[in-house]
């Protein structure tokens, strides 16, 4: 079974979301997703200050098997991208919940609370991937 940390929230699209501040979150793809993708060879991320809309594509992860879209877990502004992925995209495979993070997003805390409440907790995500 894939690693599913209890302290994160999860989307149906196999992304994790971690609150990092009152109005910020860090986003990445799950261990389940990186295992399904295989060896990641390229990650396309948005620019800092880009406006993302919940449910819409904001980038791509390319592996030796396929290209998969990344979907925004909430409507927010990009405040940081993981520049290490440009030269080391395999970090998504080796450390999906740590060094392989994708973007940091900022939204007002009320909309952030509402968006996070709609995501899976670890147990809910475990059920989602088991289906």
From Swiss-Prot:
Cofactor binding notes: Binds 1 lipoyl cofactor covalently.
Role of this protein: The glycine cleavage system catalyzes the degradation of glycine. The H protein shuttles the methylamine group of glycine from the P protein to the T protein.
The keyword NAD belongs to this UniProt entry's keyword annotation: no
PTM-bearing positions, type N6-lipoyllysine: 65
InterPro entries: Biotin_lipoyl, GCV_H, GCV_H/Fam206, GCV_H_sub, Single_hybrid_motif
Names of the cofactor(s): (R)-lipoate
GO CC list: cytosol; glycine cleavage complex
BP GO annotations: glycine decarboxylation via glycine cleavage system
Residue span(s) of domain Lipoyl-binding: 24-106
Gene3D superfamilies for the chain: 2.40.50.100
SUPFAM superfamilies documented for this protein: Single hybrid motif (SSF51230)
Annotated organism of origin: Mycolicibacterium gilvum (strain PYR-GCK) (Mycobacterium gilvum (strain PYR-GCK))
Family membership: Belongs to the GcvH family.
Keywords recorded for this protein, A-Z: Lipoyl
Name assigned to this protein: Glycine cleavage system H protein
Oligomeric form and interacting partners: The glycine cleavage system is composed of four proteins: P, T, L and H.
